[in-house]
Amino acid sequence: MKNRDVNRMTKALGLRRKIIGVRFLYFKHEYDKLSVEEYGRKTSYCMMVKHAMEDNCFKAKLENFRCRCALEALGLDEEMECVESGQRYYSLNLYESRAVAKDVTKDISRIKQKIYGVQLGPLEQLEDADVAIFMVNAYQLMRVVQGYTYKWGIPKNLYMAGNQGVCADLTAGPFEKNDMNFSVLCAGTRKMCAWEDDEMGVGLPIQQFEPLTEGIIQTMNYIDYPTQKDQISERLDDPMELGVAVDKNVHYGKLGKPYVRPSVYEQLKNGELE
């Protein structure tokens, strides 16, 4: 089912990069027993995420992390005391006062329990992923939000500060809050990973992936216009690959007209419409 949904979401949205999974490895013996290649270098966590999106599956532990903030966000090391006080962020001259810096720090997600390592790779290759992450442009993000609201209503756990865009916004946050989040990323990951200017990220707990995919597809025919539907059709190997056929003859703009025209609505209320 996971492989099918990865394919369906990728083709429905036209994603440029692979959807990846992140699995948290709590114990050393669990990490050692996992028979996937070790990352073998020391970089930022967001560079690991991009490496996974390039069709690589691997595991990494504390020694592979160059970014202190990611280590703490993902639970691989304890926070320094300067974190909760806001001193770390205030020292960067990104916030007007220590109070603002402390408030921002408080709301940046961090996994509280100790974690030994992580496994990353294309989602279809991870048996027990905890979080799914993928990159989108603005139109694709609109469709993700529409798919989410189809299933769960308006997202109520969205948060970002323009910092720690991958480690906190897309990984720790969805896991800790048990809900989808999206992020405009941060300057650090945009520089190191060379994301395109129009790219943003989506992270969600793994159990939301299948229903989110379904929500995106169930709203496709009613929201996407013929131009987008043509592009979707071109990506498909089979007309029923998404589970529903692409239909250029329907659109939500053609529906519900009695509910936007007062005079027609009166007829509806009075039983005068067939």
What are the functions of these language-model segments?
Residues 3-274:
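Acidic, serine/proline-rich low-complexity intrinsically disordered regions
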